[in-house]
């Protein structure tokens, strides 16, 4: 591999590390918001557990769990790409 191509791939790797860091930060933020939503829901009075607010909170929490899982998968995928590119320039 010539120096120019190698340097370009190293630049791509650096960009991917930045993206992965942002994805991880988003993952943490979504997880924290989900914990807050769960705490909100379970601190509701029992007589509200069958109401619309509780149901909406459950749905939001479920959606955030799905988003969190997808963000984790994305982070793992980005790291795999980085590993392959690092092997290519090694």
Predicted regions and their residues:
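Long, low-complexity or tandemly repetitive, helically biased scaffold regions used
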Residues: 2-90
């Amino acid at each position: 591999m010539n120096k120019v191509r190698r340097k370009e791939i190293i630049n791509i790797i650096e960009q991917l590390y930045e993206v992965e860091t942002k994805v991880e930060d988003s993952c943490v933020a979504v997880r924290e918001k989900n914990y807050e939503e769960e705490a909100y829901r379970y601190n509701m009075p029992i007589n509200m557990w069958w109401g619309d607010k509780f149901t909406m909170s459950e749905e939001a929490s479920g959606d955030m769990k799905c988003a969190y899982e997808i963000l984790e998968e994305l982070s793992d995928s980005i790291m795999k790409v980085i590993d392959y590119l690092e092997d290519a320039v090694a």
